[in-house]
Regions:
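Gly/Pro-rich turn-and-neighbor structural signature
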Residues: 1-52, 194-221, 236
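Beta-sheet entry/capping signal
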Residues: 3-7, 27-30, 54-56, 93-97, ...
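Aromatic- and carboxylate-enriched substrate-binding clefts and catalytic-loop regions
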Residues: 5-40, 47, 73, 95-149, ...
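Short alpha-helical segments and helix-capping/turn motifs at coil-helix boundaries
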Residues: 12-18, 38-43, 79-84, 341, ...
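Active-site clefts of carbohydrate-active enzymes
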Residues: 52-76
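Catalytic-core region of carbohydrate-active enzymes that cleave or remodel glycosidic bonds
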Residues: 72-99, 116-121, 254-264
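C-terminal non-catalytic alpha-helical accessory regions
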Residues: 133-287
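Extracytoplasmic
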Residues: 283-443
């Protein structure tokens, strides 16, 4: 048996069994898995890297299950695939890479990126993931059109990173509580909703302009690689966010219905030519894909306080970090090495305390079982803050649905002309996305 290739895959709860002491023969390859949402759950230790069987990875860009499926559109951010698979290779996961694709058509670019990285990771690293995507678009549509399309696709991936089209109904799958089957408000204020709708509207318009200028022989390729994924995602957001506004008397229900009809029309167009029967906009017939039920609410929309200062990880004035190209809510998240510091500066503060909201990538520990950081203001004492999650906990579900892990704290602040906020990573694997400063609002 030692000569027969064998693989052990500690998927989901099986990883807990492995961590509890399960012994695997040395010649068996250990196949590490992501959490189904793009974040690898375990990286091999030095002992595991030395095993005869080596290490592999089983990675998802499509998933059926809790907290919610994403089977329709290929929206896993290429920068996340790049960041996680680069880290996997650096950590000794080099024997075998397996990609769970689901429906291959919506995810053609991510599949190509994954395979190119598996074949020659250094070549992809040298050009960067943005350049890789641009070359993909140039090959299909020519240089000039690729120059115009790449920012469109990058923005489409960024918006879907914040929340996937399939997650826009604030519903869940495979939950016992029936409330998760009912479309409900996302925790967004009116301004956030309108800004997101405007961003998608702008993308959709740009895609439509290119469509009309395309030669006939390129229209089918363009429709399934660009027009359908961007405009269908835009209409999904339009359908559900307009409905959220309409529930509070802030929009017309007819706009939500028209968005649903647009998705139906786009999908029909997809399935009437070369790619007939390849696209289904209602995988598993989940509630989020239906026309939204008209239901008025007496309560108002969520109101959020305005942050006084906001920074992306890359906005630090001092410190050593690695920018994760394109990753994060604004594409400027940074990987912070263990014990390294990032410094952010702000002006005089009006009160004697400040609420600090730290937003991080919801990834898993790289070494050991912890993900921790500290925050220090003007040299104040620090306290370790943990944000790793366990299994399929409620916090983990919330994290993967919104692609951030959030921690809040209130710190005392002195009356002075300027201040220095220092973020320190205590463990490997810390990726800082954003920091927000508010007037205190938590107890």
């Amino acid at each position: 048996m030692t000569q027969v290739p064998q693989v052990f895959i500690p998927y989901k709860e099986v990883l807990d069994v492995y961590h509890a002491g399960l012994q695997v023969p040395d010649e068996v390859t250990l196949m590490w898995c992501d959490d189904n949402y793009g974040y690898i759950r375990h990286f091999p230790t030095a002992e595991e890297r030395a095993r005869k069987g080596g290490n592999g990875v089983y990675y998802h860009i499509s998933y059926w299950g809790r907290p919610h499926d994403y089977l329709w559109l290929g929206t896993v951010h290429p920068s996340l695939v790049y960041q996680q698979m680069s880290l996997a290779c650096e950590r000794g996961i080099q024997k075998m890479w397996i990609l769970n694709v689901g429906d291959i058509k919506p995810a053609e670019y991510q599949v190509e990126l994954f395979l190119d990285m598996a074949w020659n990771l250094e070549a992809v690293k040298q050009q960067g993931v943005a350049a890789h995507q641009r070359h993909f678009l140039e090959r299909e549509f020519g240089k000039n059109r690729a120059d115009r399309l790449q920012p469109v696709m990058q923005e489409a991936y960024r918006l879907a990173y914040i929340r996937k089209p399939e997650f826009m109904g604030n519903t869940r799958t495979e939950e016992k509580d029936p409330k998760f089957k009912v479309i409900s408000d996302l925790p967004w204020c009116e301004q956030e909703i309108n800004e997101r709708l405007a961003a998608y509207r702008q993308l959709s318009d740009k895609v439509e302009q290119e469509w009309h200028a395309l030669p006939a022989q390129k229209k089918e390729t363009y429709f399934q690689l660009v027009k359908y994924p961007v405009q269908a995602a835009a209409q999904m957001n339009n359908k559900l966010l307009t409905a959220q506004l309409a529930r509070h008397g802030k929009a017309d229900w007819a706009d939500s219905d028209r968005a649903y009809d647009s998705i139906v029309s786009l999908t029909k167009r997809y399935n009437t030519t070369k790619w007939n029967r390849m696209m289904d906009f209602q995988p598993r017939r989940l509630p989020v894909f239906n026309r939204v039920e008209r239901k008025a609410l007496s309560s108002g929309l969520l109101e959020k306080p305005q942050a006084v200062y906001t920074w992306n990880g890359a906005d630090c004035v001092e410190g050593a970090s690695v920018i994760c190209e394109g990753l994060g809510y604004e594409g400027k998240a940074v990987a912070v090495e263990k014990k390294k510091e990032l410094t952010f500066e702000f002006a005089a503060w009006e009160t004697d305390s400040v609420e600090v909201e730290v937003r991080l990538l919801p990834n898993h520990p790289v070494e050991g079982e912890r993900l921790r950081f500290t925050i220090s203001l003007d040299g104040s004492a620090t306290e370790a803050v943990s944000y790793e999650t366990k299994g399929r906990s409620e916090e983990w579900k919330e994290n993967v649905l919104c692609n951030q892990a959030v921690r809040r704290m209130i710190l005392p602040v002195a009356r002075k002309a300027s201040h220095r906020l220092i973020f320190t990573a205590l463990d490997e694997g810390v990726v800082l996305d954003q920091i927000y400063l508010y007037m205190p609002r938590i107890k």
